[in-house]
Amino acid sequence: MTLLAPTSPLAALTLLRYAPRGVPGALLRQGLESMQLARTPGLRFFRLLGTARGRGFGPWEPTRWAAFTVWDSAAALDAFEAHSRVAAGWRARAVEQWTLRMRPVRWHGAWGGVDPFAGFTPGAEDGQGAAAPLVVLTRATLRLRHLRAFRAAAAALEEVLARQEGLVASLAAGEVPLLKQATFSLWQSGAAVRGFAYAGQRHAGVVQRTRREGWYSEELFARLRPLSASGTWDGREPLSALLAPGLN
């Protein structure tokens, strides 16, 4: 695992699970939290996201929400977690929370018209090699006319992912249901990611079709190195088993 200096920029994914009775409040707070986050020192980019059930693009899961954030430094994220009303509210109201800190190593594309990782220095997976764990982020704005084809392809790929060796955890999220979607997946290694991306005929075929038919008006693809995690996701902390003893 790479140890990150307090002044180094980083990204984070926070998953929040609420009790069913807390869902209406979570919905109502989205707008207020967005305004507060927009004024947070050191926060370069953020998106508050709903999530789908299971690992793929299933029905909406109203009890689980996600926040993807990009920070000027680890110190800025530390200060947010220690002093922000938003972070305090998450801790007080969520029945489960998991935060993963990451450093992007390769990416291309845009999210909402901007590069969320502008200012980061790309690296060849930071020299850790193909055996180190990796996070994959995909994000796309789907053209409405391709919605039916996308849903059919997503259902087929979800079946493949369920059997994919090396996939530790994954989820689908979105800003706008069906049309503005993202996926996050945690893999045992970069080698496992490449095995899925390049050896899987069904996945490769879908990727080629999206480009040929122009499914997306905007897309982003990124690989990130997981650095540390806190809390639990569905009752477990999935990153710790992938890191060398004593480094997490």
Where are these regions (language model features)?
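Active-site/pore-lining binding-face segments in mid-to-C-terminal subdomains
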Residues: W187-A204, R211
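Residue-level detection of the helix-turn-helix DNA-binding "recognition helix"
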Residues: A82, Q208
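Flexible helix-coil linker/hinge segments at domain or subdomain boundaries
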Residues: G214-E218
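Short S/T/G/P-rich N-terminal loop/turn motif that feeds into the first structured element of a domain
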Residues: M1-F57, E61-P62, A74-F80, R93-K180, ...
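A short beta-strand motif that forms the metal-chelation/ATP-contact edge
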Residues: A182-L186
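A common structural junction motif
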Residues: R85-A94, H203-G205
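Extracellular/lumenal glycan-associated surfaces
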Residues: V70-S73, Q188
